[in-house]
Swiss-Prot record:
Keywords: Cell membrane, Glycoprotein, GPI-anchor, Lipoprotein, Membrane, Signal
Record organism: Dictyostelium discoideum (Social amoeba)
The keyword Lipoprotein appears for this protein: yes
Entry comment on modification after translation: The GPI-like-anchor contains a phosphoceramide group, rather than a phosphatidyl group.
Protein name listed in UniProt: Ponticulin-like protein F
Segment forming the signal sequence: 1-20
Cellular component per GO, a single term: side of membrane
Residue ranges the record assigns to the propeptide: 150-171
Entry's family note: Belongs to the ponticulin family.
Membrane topology reported for the UniProt record: Lipid-anchor; GPI-anchor
Origin: domain of life: Eukaryota
Covalently lipidated residues, kind GPI-like-anchor amidated glycine: 149
């Protein structure tokens, strides 16, 4: 019985971590070229903007996929000729980085939203655990009273009968 509250907390914590909602606030673009290391953050408000310059090494165009949530088409362009020469296109699903040209691109989560979701779930788990603990305690107390009551009901008549028998034998 002592392990039940701990087990409930564990289950709810796992549930909170796996079901927390993550809001993606932008994109992190990192150069995969060891000779030219570079990493920039692009806000989600720049989605649809053509030719986002990545440290002078190339350009990226990010476009939302119609009807999809957290899914984007990423076009990589060469740095010259006003971004007309495409170096390839990939569809990016948030949480799974893609490589376009020499760039690795991933969605950047909004840590605040994730933390808030986890905190809320953890609080709910704590309240549920407290309620469960209270219920278990109440049930235990009720059981104790019931046992005591039953015990009294059996012991008292038996004592009276024994007393009467002894008095009869004595007479």
């Amino acid at each position: 019985m002592k392990f039940i509250p701990a087990l409930i907390i564990f289950v709810f914590t796992i549930f909170a971590l796996t079901n927390s909602e993550t809001t993606y606030s932008g994109f992190k673009i990192t150069s995969a070229d060891p000779k030219n290391p570079c990493s920039i953050s692009v806000p989600q408000t720049d989605v649809g903007t053509k030719c986002i310059d990545v440290c002078g090494q190339g350009n990226i165009n990010i476009a939302a996929v119609s009807g999809e949530t957290n899914k984007y088409d990423i076009n990589g362009y060469q740095a010259t000729d006003q971004c007309k020469n495409s170096a390839g296109q990939q569809t990016l699903t948030c949480g799974t980085p893609v490589t376009v040209g020499v760039f690795s691109i991933d969605c950047a989560p909004d840590a605040g939203a994730t933390t808030a979701a986890v905190t809320t779930a953890a609080t709910t788990a704590a309240v549920t655990t407290a309620a469960t603990t209270a219920a278990v305690t109440t049930a235990s107390t009720t059981a104790a009273f019931t046992t005591t009551g039953t015990s009294s009901t059996i012991v008292i008549p038996f004592a009276l009968i024994l007393s009467l028998l002894l008095s009869v034998i004595t007479l």
